[in-house]
Design a protein with these regions (language model features):
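N-terminal strand-loop element at the rim of the active site
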Residues: 9-22, 28-73, 160-162, 229-231
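A conserved mid-protein helix/loop that constitutes part of the nucleotide-sugar donor-binding site
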Residues: 19-24, 194, 198-217, 230-233
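Short alpha-helical donor nucleotide-sugar binding micro-motif in glycosyltransferases
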Residues: 85, 245-246, 253-258
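Short hydrophobic beta-strand element within catalytic cores of glycosyltransferases
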Residues: 283-286
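Conserved acidic donor-binding segment of nucleotide-sugar-dependent glycosyltransferases
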Residues: 297-309, 316-322
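A charged, aromatic-enriched C-terminal amphipathic alpha-helix characteristic of glycosyltransferases
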Residues: 323-352
Length: 354
């Protein structure tokens, strides 16, 4: 039997949806490739994160990776990932998230086939001031000239990439349906009042202020935020419950026993929580941003909203007959947004490059 080709993933943002994406993709590809993951631990990274990975996957922590720009740490991370790659001698390198993408594209000369997935460009993040966003875009523009293919995780992100480089493609994010279904099957379904939920860190990106406004406009509806974060004080409406940080099975239990998934984000890549909610046949009501609007088509498989009033109206509609919407969303995940489809498309691109 021929020796498996070595693939090295370099991941700085190992938390939230990116963590789930990396776990699902690596676990799916390990049957075909010898998988190595060089990563950084974040606050959102599960404490038992190693248990999520197939035992055949090699995990290597990058000690100097950090989210913020820090010249000393970033230079140290540059040499650290070069050393890791020199020891592994991978046949292909795939960089994930903006920080890994910037450092990695400078660190490697392109002799080894290299891919980069932004998972949401940093220059689109509205919590950064305009000057900082211009710097982030300049960094992406310079790095885009390197010998590297950018693979975006949604059509919208791909359109942004094409403004930077033509060496680009996209593969839609996908979810592990089998693993999710297993958790759903083990979850007790309980009677509950009409419930709207969201999932993730309570931070500027996820727009808790808008979530609170929507809840205040619908005092007869129960709202649940699955997660925690620095802006939890923004969630003041009396009909909002905050779960705090919970494990995956508990988060799914909350979701299963709810009716509508709301995602009022200011920006997104292609959210895993949205795809999982579509699979669970929840009515999905999302903001009109890249990622969300690539998956949800207004009135066909959910609702896309541009104002608090539109969110409120959509949730009111969701209290009526919605089976056609939720069934279409479910079928979309079965056909397009699942790990098997995603892994097969990546495998094809890897094979063409090695």
């Amino acid at each position: 039997m021929a020796e498996k080709k070595k693939i090295l993933y370099i991941v700085e943002a190992m938390g939230g949806g990116v963590f789930t994406y990396i776990v699902d993709l690596a676990n799916e590809l390990v049957n075909k490739y010898d998988m190595y993951i060089a990563y950084a631990v974040r606050k959102q990274t599960p404490k038992n994160y190693k248990d999520y990975f197939d035992k055949r996957i090699h995990l290597i922590e990058v000690r100097n990776f950090g989210r913020a720009i820090n010249p000393i740490k970033d230079i140290a991370a540059f040499f650290e990932i070069k050393k890791i790659a020199a020891e592994i001698k991978p046949d292909l390198i795939h960089l994930h998230s903006s920080k890994a993408g910037a450092i990695g594209r400078v660190a490697f000369d392109g002799k080894i086939p290299m891919f980069y997935t932004p998972h949401g460009y940093s220059f689109l993040m509205e919590n950064c001031n305009p000057a900082k966003r211009r710097v982030f875009k300049l960094i992406e523009s310079v790095c885009a000239k390197r010998n590297c293919t950018t693979i975006s995780c949604s059509v919208g992100e791909h359109q942004e990439t094409l403004k930077l480089t033509k060496n680009a493609a996209y593969v839609n994010n996908g979810i592990n349906m089998e693993e999710l279904q297993e958790i759903i099957d083990q979850t007790e379904k309980v009677e509950h009042p009409f419930t709207v939920f969201t999932l993730g860190r309570i931070c500027y990106q996820k727009n808790p202020t808008l979530f609170n406004t929507i809840a205040e406009s619908l005092p007869d509806v129960r709202f649940v935020w699955i997660g925690d974060g620095e802006l939890r004080e923004e969630l003041k409406s009396k009909n909002i419950e905050i779960s705090g940080w919970v494990d995956r099975s508990t988060a799914i239990k909350y979701a299963v026993n709810a009716d509508v998934f709301v995602l009022p984000s200011r920006w997104e890549g292609l959210p895993i929580s949205l795809l999982e909610s579509m699979y669970m046949r929840k009515v999905c009501v999302v903001s009109n941003v890249i990622g969300n609007r690539d998956v949800i088509h207004n009135g066909e498989n959910g609702f896309v909203c541009s104002s608090a009033e539109a969110f409120v109206e959509a949730i009111r509609k969701a209290q009526g007959e919605t089976q056609e919407l939720t069934e279409q969303a479910y079928q979309d995940v079965l056909n397009k947004y699942n790990t098997k489809v995603m892994a097969e498309q990546y495998s094809r691109k890897y094979k063409e490059s090695i």
